[in-house]
From Swiss-Prot:
This is Catalase easC. It comes from Trichophyton verrucosum (strain HKI 0517). Pfam families: Catalase. The keyword Oxidoreductase applies. GO terms for cellular component: mitochondrion; peroxisome. It is an enzyme of class 1 (oxidoreductase).
Length: 478
């Protein structure tokens, strides 16, 4: 049969060359249309495994500009010199669910930034909360599974979440925030993000400071009359579209970079463990009675360019908290130490062993200063296996978050959080509900009472024969 005209031939393979293609697909001795075979084989392999967490996401390019001199605490080339600019790419994401899920799910939100510095890539891998559910990395798989779909029904099941929380009280602090208005979707443009972990900024002489840095949205969380902006339930990609369209029309979102600083000699005196990821560095809101760790603004991140090809420019991005540059070192935080292995290992599975064509090398700056026996004793205590067990601070931080909400936001803000918790608790069996109430009794008797009364009222209402709805196993988490 006659070949197709070259100008009608699809571009095949990596060469991009056009050539005549025979229209016959098979002959008596088998397939001969190698171009069709090549196209089919490429199609079969064009997708890659989705991320184990943070599968649903979007991204954009931008730049970071230094806005303040922090050379007294910092020896990082990218941050030295007011006005210095660095190009970057940012990826936003939800955490627990799959790639096709909604932007508006009640979930942690991720904001990862890769800075293309003159000394290599520096990744800030952040969440929209300054703390996390766990401090023991061995619990991470169980924690994530508790937030995902029921393995039997493939529906979201709040009972799995509450089973985990009641057995791991360090998760109470995070659980309260997740069920408040902070846990619902704003937009990616109004999302603030926190690295959560302590890092070390190391000076040329080997001295260092513990630091926690974060990006505060210049638009702020878009609370209106104490509530969050509602996501269109018919548009699961609401935030993705909002970010893309804003950048296209020149309405560039921006964030102010801030850093909190702790001298290692002061760390044992703060009244809480700065290496415990279930606790935040107090900016002055809560807990009362603990030292405030003020922040210093030092830069501005602006996103000003959309990607052209999502798959190659965003889906294939590989972030890791181990991607550091000279002047930055990881702290002894156990979760951080585990993430520094888990992230690159996940990329090797998802993208292959050669996803880093030219592995980056950084010069180590050893922390050599002798900080004395008090610091060494504190460090050995707060990184010991015993510290992973429940203790009073796990309840204290959750308690003070609950109590500060009317003052920090509004009474209605606190009431909505309680209502969301009740709706999530109510579908569970009686034994699990009782365990939840007993757990919250250790946080606040008032909160436990409100949860018991609210959740049991929902249970009673749904048990009525004429109730329009009944609690179903695995129903959507509210």
């Amino acid at each position: 049969m006659a070949p197709n005209a070259a100008d009608k031939c699809p571009v095949m393979g990596n060469s991009g060359e056009k050539c005549p293609v025979m229209s016959s697909s098979t002959q008596s001795r088998g397939p001969r249309d190698i171009y069709t075979l090549e196209a089919l084989s490429h199609f079969n392999r064009e997708k890659i495994p989705e991320r184990a967490v943070h599968a649903k996401g979007t991204g954009a390019y931008g730049e970071f500009e230094v806005t303040a001199d922090i050379s007294d605490i910092c020896n990082i080339d990218m941050l030295l010199g007011v006005g210095k600019k660095t190009q970057c790419v940012t990826r936003f994401s939800t955490t627990g669910l799959e790639r096709g899920s909604s932007d508006g799910v009640r979930d942690l939100k991720g904001m990862a930034v890769k800075f293309f510095t003159e000394q290599g890539d520096w990744d800030w891998v952040s969440l929209n909360f300054p703390f996390f559910f766990i401090r023991d990395p061995a619990k991470f798989p169980d924690m994530i599974h508790s937030q995902r779909r029921d393995p039997q029904t493939n529906l979201l099941n709040p009972n799995m979440t509450w089973d985990f929380v009641t057995k791991n009280p360090e998760a109470l602090h995070m659980t309260l925030l997740q069920h408040s208005d902070f846990g619902t979707m704003f937009t990616w443009r109004t999302l603030s993000s926190y690295v959560g972990h302590a890092f070390k900024w190391v000076m040329p002489d080997g001295s260092f400071k513990y630091v926690h840095f974060f990006l505060a949205s210049d638009r702020g969380p878009n609370f209106t009359d104490g509530s969050t902006a509602k996501v269109d339930p018919n548009d699961p990609d609401f935030a993705t579209k909002d970010l893309f369209e804003a950048i296209e029309r020149g309405d560039y979102p921006s964030w102010t970079a801030n850093v909190q600083v702790v001298d290692p000699k002061d760390a044992p005196k703060l009244g809480f463990n700065i290496l415990d990821l279930t606790k935040h560095w107090n900016l002055g809101t809560y807990p009362k009675g603990l030292d405030t760790i003020p922040s210093r603004p030092f830069g501005k991140l602006t996103l000003n360019r959309n990607v052209k090809d999502y798959f190659s420019e965003v889906e294939k991005l590989a972030f890791s908290p181990s991607n550091l540059v000279p002047g930055v070192e990881p702290s002894e935080d156990p979760i951080l130490q585990a993430r520094m292995f888990a992230y690159p290992d996940a990329q090797r599975y998802r993208l292959g062993i050669d996803h880093l064509k030219a592995p980056l090398r950084r010069k180590e700056t050893a922390c050599q200063h002798d900080l004395g026996p008090e610091f060494e004793k504190w460090l050995s205590q707060v990184t010991s296996e015993a510290w992973s067990h429940p203790h009073e601070d796990d309840y204290k931080f959750a308690r003070e978050y609950y109590e500060v909400l009317p003052e920090f936001r509004s009474q209605e803000f606190q009431d909505r959080m309680v209502e969301n918790l009740c709706k999530s608790i109510a579908p569970g069996p009686e034994e699990l509900r009782k365990r939840v109430y007993d757990t919250f009794e250790l946080v606040s008797s008032e909160l436990a009472r409100r949860l018991r009364e609210g959740a049991e009222a929902i249970v009673a209402e749904k048990a009525r024969p004429d109730s329009p709805s009944r609690a179903q196993p695995g129903q959507l988490r509210l």
